[in-house]
């Protein structure tokens, strides 16, 4: 790992005046840890592997230096000629993230007077409009792998002049099954290029990818930088009582907003209907919704018009809500990595957040796997009025133990599970 002295200001990172002016307008007061460590290396042309919590400011981490290098190319006349070429390619796993990243880049570039062209391409919308947007090429292309391959096969864009490749949320792209698409795209890129890889987790697939693609990269690992800002809690419930417990928590806590995760599209609709019968209005967000409807729901949630959103994992990435109070796992995610992606929607950028998982006895084994893979241990708790019925297998109700004991710790006494009065924020630090 690389040890870097953290600059105090964006000016010390070597950013140019138009970018500094825009950051001041956006009230970015100082670089986040990932920005402070990565931006100088990116400006120097180094390959980069970065692991950081969601909400750590990683979009600006790669967007700002890419914009600065493009501006320098324009000023010196080194910008690529006209044609269906792209200079900076950013690959992302979902259409929502593609749109969000492109919007952020355009926002950072407002003082460049339209000199830098940014285009986002993704599935679920007309390919013809995207082909039209790519006429004459583009400086920055933010794309999902599948749609990009479609556009390449239509000769709408070429990748042989790409200078920088950004793999944003690489673990998510691989977990969604984009391995073949990524391999096909990599084969079309020039050998000489800068590669920036960002990933919240580093499973074996991602490690292999970094070994194959990157050249002597700078490595930055900051996943644990703001762990203390996110409180994780686990509540045991009886089978069939999750909806009642969820409604109780929503009504009692009166959260400003809540993001609830389920594992299937039809579960979204079903849970929304059951909550509606209990007087709680919830919007749903999943892959069967058209792009315009999904955009409407996301915009409504971001502006606060929608208080409760029920979503599948398609929303676990690319959803950036300021000060989201709570994320609730109504169903446990299928993979330990997806657990981290889900809960990363709350407690972002130093804000205090809360992640709640509701588990019945059928979930216990899977949650232990999630804990083991993510090297966490969470106490099982119960909510007053919804105590768990006694079951024959006491080991199921036993809280999972740490995977390894510290030396000399000896045997640990098993603690009784708490029964609480749903004081969900117990243990959280005060927040404005």
Tell what function each PLM region has.
Residues 2-394:
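Conserved helicase RecA-like core
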Residues 377-432:
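Non-catalytic, charged low-complexity extensions flanking SF2 helicase motor domains
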